Regions:
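Multi-pass membrane proteins that catalyze or facilitate reactions on polyprenyl-/lipid-phosphate substrates
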Residues: 1-63, 74-298, 302-451
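Conserved beta-loop-alpha segment that forms the PLP phosphate-binding cup at the N-terminus of a helix
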Residues: 70
């Protein structure tokens, strides 16, 4: 028997405080960001059940754009309706946007961000520990049958060894889940969905129906409002500053990239780098690398690097505006067209996805995706570990196999020590995340001061 979820599951102010605290911890790319929400929303506050969380994540993994921000919008919508989704999604990117905006200005002025980079270099090992904990916990709760363990391992190997396209990995996992539903439905039987840890039931249990009834009329309204919000700033810039201005070009270009970022930011960054450097000459190859480093060491989605690209491009070609006004406009417009589509995708699709949770065939396909997501997060964790602990990596290839390996001689002793300390604080001392992040950030900064 299902129950009806209320419009506001928790007080709105309490939700805003929680999303603000989560937004300050969104380091380490999607793996780290999903880990933060998993720990905060599912395990600590118990606002949402594990299966419900996985269901939302599965849908977000199918969409273009930053899946972690989309997950925040989805859960915010479940907890507090449309305003909850708007607040959760906005706060998720706001700290990173402001931080990268400030660092972009610092870079333009002094061409140096050494101290800031060192500060965040201490955070990276802490995020590695948090991600490791998330992989273990999500695996324990999601891989309820040896078959799904095999799916997770296969997804990891497909990405790590074969470089398989992310959409194909997800599609195969969904097909496996659907096939299991047809041939061996007993494999899909689940527990109570409360995490199996003996704690209290979540405020949004796994069998609760959302109060919003999907309809084509409401979908049409959402689509109309979303498209106007998305494209109105681009049209205004084109009208006021000209269709050949750098701002119109950036608005159109980054609106397009927002629709093709399947499988995470890395899947589209090569295309962005090529066009931004070679076609538009907004920045140099070295500056693209520096922007990526800054985006990796600030909170928020990695695709935020496009803000840095737009900032430099508009600063150097501001048209009728001053360089600083142009840089600010370019950065804000690019951020807008990159993240507004995420709200549209969630508000448009979530009501329908919620009603499909009790469709056994679709639920089975999403269960297969859940297993694959464990492998995806593990692969992201491996990538993050290699680039946190080592300065350089190389690609080892043999026949169809290809894997990125670290160069042992480039290991960072400081990063290794901070990682061990972070693992101890996470698994042994079980300290809160903010404390771990703060201590590791100070350790990273101390290394620069000592040198």
């Amino acid at each position: 028997m299902t129950t009806q979820a209320p419009a506001d599951v928790i007080p709105f102010r309490e939700a805003v405080r929680a999303w603000f605290l989560i937004s300050l911890q969104t380091f380490g790319g999607p793996a780290g960001q999903i880990a933060v929400m998993q720990r905060t929303l599912v395990e600590e506050k118990r606002w949402i059940g594990q299966q419900r969380f996985n269901h939302a994540l599965n849908y977000c993994m199918l969409l273009p754009g930053p899946e972690a921000q989309q997950l925040a919008i989805y859960v915010g919508w479940l907890l507090n309706g449309t305003r909850g989704g708007l607040v959760a999604g906005t706060l998720f990117v706001l700290p990173g946007m402001l931080a990268l905006l400030a660092l972009s200005a610092v870079y333009v002025l002094w061409q140096d961000t050494t101290v800031v980079t060192a500060l965040f270099a201490g955070i990276a090992p802490a995020v590695l520990a948090i991600v490791s904990q998330a992989v273990i916990r999500v695996a324990k709760r999601s891989l309820t049958h040896p078959l799904f363990v095999a799916v997770a391992v296969a997804a990891f190997l497909a990405l790590a060894l074969f470089g398989a396209p992310f959409p194909i990995v997800i599609a195969v996992a969904a097909l496996i889940g659907w096939t299991v539903h047809k041939l061996a439905p007993h494999v899909l039987k689940k527990g109570n969905g409360h995490g199996g840890d003996g704690g209290p039931a979540p405020l949004i249990p796994d069998d609760a129906l959302h109060h919003v009834q999907p309809s084509w009329r409401s979908a049409g309204k959402i689509l109309a409002v979303g498209l106007v919000a998305w494209w109105l700033p681009v049209a205004a810039v084109a009208l006021l500053l000209g269709t050949d201005s750098v701002f119109t070009t950036q608005g159109l270009f980054f609106s397009g990239t927002a629709l093709v970022t399947f499988g995470g930011a890395y899947a589209v960054l090569a295309f962005v780098a090529q066009r931004a450097v070679e076609t538009y000459a907004w920045l140099t190859p070295g500056e693209m690398v520096r922007g990526l480093a800054l985006a990796e060491t600030t909170p928020g989605p990695l695709i935020m690097v496009v803000q840095f690209v737009a900032f430099l491009g508009a600063y150097r070609d501001p048209g009728a505006l001053t360089p600083w006004a142009g840089a600010l406009l370019g950065a804000l417009l690019t951020t807008w067209v990159t993240f507004v589509p995420c709200f549209l995708f969630i508000f448009l699709g979530a009501p329908h996805v919620e009603r499909l949770r009790h469709n056994t065939a679709i639920s089975a396909a999403l269960t297969g995706i859940t297993a694959a997501v464990v492998g995806v997060i593990a692969n992201l964790a491996l990538y993050f570990a290699e680039h946190t602990l080592f300065a350089r990596t190389f690609t080892w290839a043999w026949g169809p196999f290809s894997i990125q390996l670290p160069e042992p001689s480039t290991v960072s002793p400081i990063a290794l020590v901070i990682t061990v300390a972070a693992l101890a604080m996470t698994f042994v001392l079980k300290w809160p995340m903010l404390r771990i992040l703060g201590i590791c950030a100070l350790l990273g900064l101390a290394t620069v001061l000592l040198q």
